[in-house]
Design a protein with these regions (language model features):
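Beta-hairpin "wing" of winged helix-turn-helix
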Residues: 49-60
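Histidine-centered divalent metal-coordination motifs
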Residues: 13, 43-44
Length: 64
């Protein structure tokens, strides 16, 4: 439960969740919408996944 609250405490992570609620996006696609680096998006996604709020799926060379 603590991990969920920590994940949701970040405004960028809440925005990422809102985007992912409507479409499967890669870190690169999310980064383009937020104008932040892909590594920063990947870190946010790692926190969200650790909290059980998102899952990842590899499709070819991309992770969705």
């Amino acid at each position: 439960m603590q991990k969920v609250f920590e994940a949701l405490a970040s405004t960028p992570r809440r925005k990422i969740l809102a985007y992912l609620a409507h479409a499967d996006l890669t870190a690169g696609e999310i980064a383009a919408r937020f104008e932040i680096s892909k590594p920063a998006v990947s870190q946010h996604l790692t926190v969200l996944e650790a909290a059980g709020l998102v899952t990842s799926e590899k499709r070819g060379q991309f992770v969705h």
